[in-house]
């Protein structure tokens, strides 16, 4: 195993380990990649990917060259761009190729939709490119008809709907040559494990498999041993994940009763472009949203109890700037990339150290400075300490003079 220091890139300050890769599998500028499709290169620059991020520099070439890949990087470092560029490079746009060639799966509708948008935007210069979204909450018959009519090279979706299309033989899984799992740890822990394993059983023996995630629990290593062949491993050790560029603070409270008043005081004190507030339950999200709206704050919400159209409308309106505040359960904690989000507030401290990383990572996207503020009651003190130990960081109390 070879270690490389990340002194050349500010996206992360952690040490990475690259196993199974050599220096020839890395690059520093897009022009270094001689085999890159010129149409794709134009799309990359049009999407403002001027310089490849750390994870892109180390993962794109191994994928392009046919290796299985396990890639771990903290949130906001360009994982979607990494597998998006690689996927667009490996597909064949020959109109005679009518089967789905690449399958990208994510744990939530919102993340799948965003991945579809990124891949589509990166490939705007690639004539004949077709990317289809497969998620729950839409008509399965319409999805099947579109698969038949459009014959997309790339499908992006959630495991449930994807497996349904495979089971119905609307997708010929045997001819898929690349499978990408984004936020794979979340999919394995949130009820998708059986569906993912079922999908693997339908794939051909030579399918290329790539796993991307901010965390790599043991279950992912078990999956890799079952379905991957000598994968290139690009890992950031968990204890070294530092959330570079994000200022982290906590506000100490006696109990939950003082949270809403504290939140109002916070909004009077700090200025922010856009803000995401996380709660630990659907009811908390609904109650807080109602209270914020009654106080005149431009707030909307997303939680798992909403139907697809309502969630999409809220997300699109927030992204467009119609609302400055998004109140959410953990359904948006992974992969949602809105560059205007400068502040994340944990109204409830997350119960998982991994979720803390994903939530706070919604701020400070693509090298921008961000702020994460957590409300911490007396009963949360042990969890706060666990987070600090796990990420080898200190989350200081927000100073009374803080102005953001």
Indicate where each model-derived feature is located.
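Conserved helicase RecA-like core
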Residues: 2-10, 18-404
